[in-house]
Regions:
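Hydrophobic beta-strand positions
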Residues: 32-33, 150
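Active-site loop architecture of trypsin-fold serine endopeptidases
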Residues: 1-2, 12-29, 35, 39-66, ...
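Extracellular/periplasmic catalytic domains that process cell-envelope and extracellular macromolecules
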Residues: 10-11, 25, 33-35, 112, ...
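Short, conserved beta-turn/loop elements at beta-strand boundaries and strand-helix junctions
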Residues: 9-13, 91-92
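Conserved beta-propeller blade repeats
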Residues: 30-31, 108
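Short beta-strand-centered aromatic/proline hotspots
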Residues: 3-7
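C-terminal recognition in membrane/secretory proteostasis and scaffolding
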Residues: 40, 67-183
């Protein structure tokens, strides 16, 4: 393979640089390099099943990777935040995040309701959320109160949410999966 970039894709909940580079468990995490400039444009991360396609690989875009590196450099945990909300695509608008359900009924943490449309972080309105991965990326490194720009019943409003790290599964005594508790 030559590592030819064939496009940017949204797949599995995040943006990827699509390439024909052969990616496997031995080289995942390696750089995807622009041969014209010598710059790293992505971090090779995943491959599509060889049965489905031949040589279809995906790399994390450097914009996302650089943000994680910057957070690490500053001693900030870059882990994805805990988001107690599920999303769906807004009606006939593939470029908006519409709230489908709120898992924790704690309005002081996430005062969102089903059918709210989450637009952007306050102060970053020029970077609107298109997919859930945009929200996750924007909230990386945040710990505490954050303001979201939300549209509810046609009215744009600001809501303060509590951003917190995702709970570590290893800290749990038991895990509930499909009606069974493993402890």
């Amino acid at each position: 393979t030559r590592g030819i970039v064939s496009g940017n894709r949204y797949r599995w909940g995040r943006y990827w640089v699509q390439t024909d580079a052969a990616i496997n468990s031995g080289n995942s995490g390696g750089p995807l390099i622009n041969l014209d400039t010598g710059k790293v444009i992505g971090i090779n991360s995943a491959t599509y099943s060889k049965r489905m396609s031949e040589g279809l690989g995906f790399a994390v875009h450097m914009i996302r990777a650089c943000r994680v590196l910057e957070l690490l450099k500053n001693g900030i945990d870059p882990s994805p935040p805990y988001i107690p909300v599920s999303f769906t695509q807004a009606d006939n608008k593939l470029d908006q995040l519409k709230v489908a359900a709120v898992y924790e009924k704690q309005p002081h943490l996430w005062p969102l309701e089903p059918n709210d449309t989450v637009l952007a972080l306050v102060g970053f309105e020029n970077n609107p959320f298109v997919h859930q991965s945009d929200l996750i990326h924007a909230l990386r490194g945040q710990d505490g109160l954050v303001e979201l720009l939300v549209e509810r019943l046609g009215i744009r409003q600001t809501f303060t949410i509590t951003a917190r790290p995702r709970p570590n599964l290893l800290d749990k005594i038991g895990v509930h999966v499909s009606g069974i508790i493993f402890g």
